Amino acid sequence: MLLPLLALGVLASSGGAQAPKIIAQRDISFAPRTVTIKVGEQVIFRNDDPFGHNVYSPAQESIFDIGLQEPGTETPVTFAVPGEFTIQCRIHPKMRAKVTVTE
């Protein structure tokens, strides 16, 4: 789990940061499908399905792959650069979401 965070250039949390946004994996889809956060904030990927998912982003600026995420688990990812990032599941290729990161 350390590798995805290093790939994103993880930033230390600060007192002024917003609470993390949650993107759930439910019924073989992401919910919500779009979130907007600021640079340095986290998105928590939560698996609410009864089976595993593999959440990743192929974007050059924000490559991460959290590996197999078991049912009932949460994995935080900090986004360190601005941009729009497509989020996908390697196990279920039709699952897609978008994280927009602003300055």
Please annotate each region the language model reported.
Residues L5-E103:
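Extracytoplasmic copper-binding redox domains, predominantly the cupredoxin/blue-copper superfamily
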